[in-house]
């Protein structure tokens, strides 16, 4: 099964299945000298961890173990292997799935591709969102390394089902980590919570849209024509389980506008040139402009639901119904925000290393100190959130 790696210089390879012994990631291309601890990884993993209100009831502690690539609290430049054990697995929930593939899920395509006898049906196996633990762990390293340029990444759940959020500034989006449903304001949070409760009672689920904003990104990232930053961001985001769409800046809204409406005036901003409204979402010509990068992605409703759905019994070939048991997110988009943040970070740090914005081989001591100071400031901004979700 190829296709488990992402990136060129900062390259990750995730491994593991939903109900296997563990999941994890190998991260290659991290410069030597970056200060890195288990706490750094746990901090980011806490925001996607299940077992909390409004998300999956699967109670995983998600404690990362760094196996290689770090010595005396600093990266050595060699591959960093991280493993997270699966500790709350109940495979008996999936006995019916073994003979009745779930509508909307990857069950039947995996059978078609790899053969029924090779299919790990337990919790979705490799197609499960449990795989994203490795992405978020690697994303923590990427986010920290981006502090070299004082680049911050934050995300929120912009919409859930029929409920949309009002516009929000970066601080509001950053503080959405306080929200159990990743909402950026109290009124929207209450509406999101009501929808999730409703879906849970009905045995159903909702889709949503995540919005990710990158503050102070380096200008000049992206390599036309086939390695445009927008193309790599799209690939990164669309690789996330349950994601069905991607846009940046005005996105699909631009298709309904005139050029005079969609174009953004170039203006002087202090000692540099910039754009008045950042309608392009920080990307033009496939290259970052230095303005905030704004991307959005849509998540479909969670496929595994209790409400009966039509399928086929693989034993008989006859029509059948399935009501999926187990512990599933009523809205996978809630925890998907953290995964989307991580994929944006992984894309940007890879391009930063490729372009030389970040030293690709080693960090000087002063550079490592500055990164650490900025990272601690970021963690303190979000600290109440991490504690409230533990």
From Swiss-Prot:
InterPro entries, per database record: Chorismate_synth, Chorismate_synth_AroC_sf, Chorismate_synthase_CS
Keyword Transferase: no
The organism's place on the tree of life at top rank: Archaea
Enzyme class: lyase
UniProt-listed Enzyme Commission number(s): 4.2.3.5
GO terms under cellular component: cytosol
Residues noted as binding FMN in the record, renumbered to the chain: 126-128, 285, 300-304, 327
Keywords: Amino-acid biosynthesis, Aromatic amino acid biosynthesis, FAD, Flavoprotein, FMN, Lyase, NADP
GO biological process terms on file: amino acid biosynthetic process; aromatic amino acid family biosynthetic process; chorismate biosynthetic process
Chemical reaction(s) catalysed: 5-O-(1-carboxyvinyl)-3-phosphoshikimate = chorismate + phosphate
GO molecular function: chorismate synthase activity; FMN binding
Its job: This reaction introduces a second double bond into the aromatic ring system.
Family: Belongs to the chorismate synthase family.
PANTHER family associated with the record: CHORISMATE SYNTHASE
Name of the featured protein: Chorismate synthase
Organism of derivation: Metallosphaera sedula (strain ATCC 51363 / DSM 5348 / JCM 9185 / NBRC 15509 / TH2)
Organism ancestry: Archaea, Thermoproteota, Thermoprotei, Sulfolobales, Sulfolobaceae
Gene this protein is translated from: aroC
């Amino acid at each position: 099964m190829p296709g488990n790696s992402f990136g060129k210089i900062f390259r990750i390879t995730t491994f593991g299945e939903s109900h296997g012994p563990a999941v994890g990631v190998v991260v290659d291309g991290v410069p030597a000298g970056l200060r890195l601890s288990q706490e750094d990884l746990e901090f980011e993993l806490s925001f996607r961890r299940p077992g909390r209100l409004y998300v999956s009831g699967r109670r995983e502690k998600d404690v990362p173990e760094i196996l290689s690539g770090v010595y005396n609290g600093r990266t050595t430049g060699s591959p960093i292997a991280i493993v997270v054990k699966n500790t709350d697995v109940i495979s008996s929930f999936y006995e019916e799935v073994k003979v009745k593939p779930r509508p909307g899920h990857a069950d039947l395509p995996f059978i078609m591709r790899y053969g029924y006898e090779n299919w790990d049906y337990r919790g979705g196996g490799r197609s499960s969102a449990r795989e994203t633990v490795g992405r978020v762990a690697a994303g923590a390293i990427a986010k920290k390394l981006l502090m070299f340029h004082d680049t911050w990444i934050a995300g929120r759940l912009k919409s859930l089902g029929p409920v949309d959020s009002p516009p929000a500034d970066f601080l509001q989006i950053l503080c959405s980590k306080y929200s159990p449903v990743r909402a950026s304001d109290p009124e929207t949070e209450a509406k999101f919570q009501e929808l999730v409760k409703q879906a849970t009672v009905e045995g159903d689920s909702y889709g949503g849209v995540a919005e990710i904003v990158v503050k102070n990104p380096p200008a000049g990232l992206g390599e036309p024509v086939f390695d445009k930053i927008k193309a790599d961001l799209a690939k990164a985001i669309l690789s996330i389980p349950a994601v069905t769409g991607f846009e940046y800046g005005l996105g699909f809204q631009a298709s309904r506008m005139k050029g005079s409406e969609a174009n953004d005036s170039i203006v002087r901003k202090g000692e540099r040139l910039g754009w008045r409204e950042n309608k392009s979402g920080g990307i033009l010509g496939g290259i970052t402009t230095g303005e905030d990068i704004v991307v959005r992605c849509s998540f479909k409703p969670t496929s595994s639901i209790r409400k009966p759905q039509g399928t086929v019994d693989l034993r008989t070939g006859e029509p059948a119904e399935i009501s999926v048991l187990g512990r599933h997110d009523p809205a996978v988009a809630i925890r998907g925000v953290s995964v989307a943040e991580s994929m944006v970070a992984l894309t940007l740090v890879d391009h930063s290393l490729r372009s030389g914005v970040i030293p690709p081989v080693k960090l000087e001591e002063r550079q490592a100190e500055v990164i650490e100071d900025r990272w601690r400031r970021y963690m303190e901004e979000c600290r109440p959130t991490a504690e409230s979700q533990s």
